[in-house]
């Protein structure tokens, strides 16, 4: 009996050791950051439905590993999922490691995924937990549900955590009531999820956030951006911290604010507290008369001078850089790079060296039968000509 138990314990020990070795081997990040010229991350099969892929997002984990996901238009049934791909060489090559499935409704995880690594513990989830937020939406688009999932093993397995927001039909029409486009950020002991909200009858769409300290219990909805004209549609919020301690909040402003035709120029606000953008002044990105439109993303890098560089992407090809902490008169346009326009490109400066800017895209809005997922890595200093 004791011998049997001892042998069993030894066998378990060997399995645990083998698993640890496998995990450690998988987790090794190879080499150093380098530039990458538009590498193909994922080519969807021919049976994928239009638009095939959209809305690529990435996260860099604390050990240098990169994860990527996107809207994935696989044929249904079965329900759609968010794929998780991993890079161990700073974006040069990628491998699928898991799929985040809808574990609650069975609708499928359909729209607008976002990845984030916890810098500190929240509730039962330790620092290093990877979070994914996105929308569970049925095939008929009859409702929207912004959900929170978590991975305790760097993206290999996933568990449902909580519901953040529920809305109506997934159509971007004024009068409908969906919720869209989550973005996660941690401030002090609070985790914030920013998103677009059409549920308020006073606004075609507004920008809001909700807060949590345990990933399970969420605050009431807090307004971030509202505009007095009902048909205005601020959307797609992204937040990044500046070196002076302020926070840069970028969004698209659907409306006629600066044009006679309805368009989506890129606006931004700057605040001392990322929970208090509602009273901050509006500015728009304008680089010598070129005003970018739609699907923004923003990051900050220390490269570019004493204030570093705010880098903004839009739905068009160029990047827009501000080296004066968001001064409205200091935007510069740069378009000498190969990563194509997309809905929507995401940006990431690499922690090992924030001169390296990773740009990911998954194609354009339908009809778009040639979409795929690509990644490029550039040096901001080279973009700036430094």
Residue ranges and their predicted role:
Residues 6-13, 175-178, 192-193:
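Long, low-complexity intrinsically disordered regions
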Residues 19-54, 59-110, 118-174, 186-230, ...:
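Beta-rich carbohydrate-recognition and catalytic domains
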Residues 55-57, 112-114, 181-183, 236-238, ...:
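Conserved beta-strand position repeated once per blade in WD40 beta-propeller domains
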């Amino acid at each position: 009996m004791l011998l049997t138990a001892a042998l069993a314990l030894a066998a378990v020990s060997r399995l645990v050791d083998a698993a640890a070795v496998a995990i450690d081997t998988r987790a090794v990040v190879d080499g150093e950051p380098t530039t990458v010229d538009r590498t193909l991350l994922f080519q969807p099969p021919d049976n994928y439905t239009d638009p095939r892929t959209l809305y690529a997002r990435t996260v860099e984990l604390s050990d240098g590993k990169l994860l990527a996901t996107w809207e994935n238009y696989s044929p249904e049934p079965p329900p759609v999922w968010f794929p998780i791909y991993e890079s161990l060489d700073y974006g040069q090559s990628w491998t699928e490691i898991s799929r985040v499935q809808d574990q609650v409704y069975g609708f499928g995880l359909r729209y607008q995924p976002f990845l984030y690594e916890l810098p500190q513990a929240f509730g039962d989830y330790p620092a290093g937990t990877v979070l994914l937020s996105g929308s569970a939406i049925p095939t008929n688009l009859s409702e929207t549900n912004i959900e929170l999932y978590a991975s305790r093993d760097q993206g290999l397995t996933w568990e449902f955590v909580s519901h953040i927001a529920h809305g109506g039909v997934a159509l971007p029409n004024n009068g409908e009531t969906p919720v869209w486009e989550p973005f996660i950020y941690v401030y002090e002991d609070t985790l914030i999820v920013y998103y677009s909200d059409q549920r308020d009858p006073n606004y075609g769409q507004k920008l809001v956030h909700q807060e949590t300290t345990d990933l399970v219990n969420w605050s009431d909805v807090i307004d971030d951006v509202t505009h007095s004209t009902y048909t205005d549609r601020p959307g797609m919020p992204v937040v990044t911290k500046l070196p002076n301690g302020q926070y840069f909040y970028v969004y698209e402003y659907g409306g006629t604010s600066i044009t006679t035709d309805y368009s989506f120029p890129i606006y931004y606000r700057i605040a001392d507290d990322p929970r208090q953008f509602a009273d901050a002044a509006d500015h728009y990105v304008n680089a010598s008369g070129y005003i970018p439109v739609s699907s923004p993303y923003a990051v900050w890098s220390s490269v570019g001078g004493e204030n570093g560089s705010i880098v903004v992407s839009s739905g068009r090809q160029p990047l827009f850089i501000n080296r004066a902490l968001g001064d409205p008169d200091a935007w510069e346009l740069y378009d000498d790079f190969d990563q194509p326009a997309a809905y929507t490109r995401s940006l990431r400066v690499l922690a090992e060296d924030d001169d390296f800017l990773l740009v990911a895209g998954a194609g354009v809005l339908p009809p778009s039968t040639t979409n795929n997922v690509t990644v490029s890595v550039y040096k901001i200093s080279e973009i700036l000509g430094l």
